[in-house]
Each structure stands twice: as C-alpha cells, then as structure tokens.
C-alpha cells in the first residue's frame, strides 16, 4: 500500500457518502486532510476538501462562510493555512460538522 493511500485511509474517519459530480453516483468520499481558504474583500471562507474514492472529484465541506477574519481564532486560522492533518481529522470525525454539510454516513 502506498504512503499516500495509507494517509488517505487514516484521515477517512467516519465513512462519508455524497453524490459525486464526476461519477454521477453516490460514492464514498475521503477526507483529503487539506483545507481551502479563500479571502474575498474583508470576508473569509474555509472549507475541508473531501475527494471521491473512485474518481478523486472534490467536494468542499464548509467550515466558515463569509466570516470576518477576526472571528476565526488566529491559531486555528494558521492551522487551516498549514493544512494541519490533526485539525482535518477532528473535523472529519465531527458528526455535527458533517450534518451541517449534508453528508451521509
């Protein structure tokens, strides 16, 4: 098993399913361990990226939407920018977070 595959399996946590835009079917999605941070003017969006296990199509699960940067703790914001795997795993195992993003598990 490749190191990359082992890391992906490690971060999968709760098995998450979603209709894949690439495959067109309900597929298992895996926590990539990566965050996407987008600043638009004086607002910030933060997503946790999941990938389709079959075709690698991405699905962004929203953590913060159109939030003022000061509302996000500075240490947490730095962890998002650094793609901290422990933080990604915490979110991936948080059922409330998954429910907010309409994930099936």
What residue spans do the PLM features occupy?
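Short, intrinsically disordered terminal segments enriched in charged and Pro/Gly residues
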Residues: 1-17, 33-41, 61-105
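Short cysteine-rich clusters marking metal-coordination/redox-active sites
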Residues: 18-23, 52-55
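Cys/His-rich microdomains that often coordinate metals
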Residues: 24-27, 59
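Generic short beta-strand segments
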Residues: 26, 30-35, 47
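Cysteine-rich micro-motifs
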Residues: 43-60
């Amino acid at each position: 098993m490749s190191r990359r595959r082992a890391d992906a399996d490690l971060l999968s946590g709760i098995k998450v399913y979603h209709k894949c835009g690439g495959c067109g079917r309900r597929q298992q999605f895996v926590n990539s361990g990566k965050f996407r941070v987008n600043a638009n003017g004086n607002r910030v969006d933060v997503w946790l990226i999941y990938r389709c296990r079959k075709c690698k199509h991405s699905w962004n699960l929203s953590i913060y939407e159109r939030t003022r940067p000061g509302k996000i703790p500075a240490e947490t914001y730095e962890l998002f920018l650094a793609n901290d795997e422990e933080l990604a795993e915490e979110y991936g195992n948080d059922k409330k977070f998954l429910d907010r993003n309409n994930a099936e598990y």
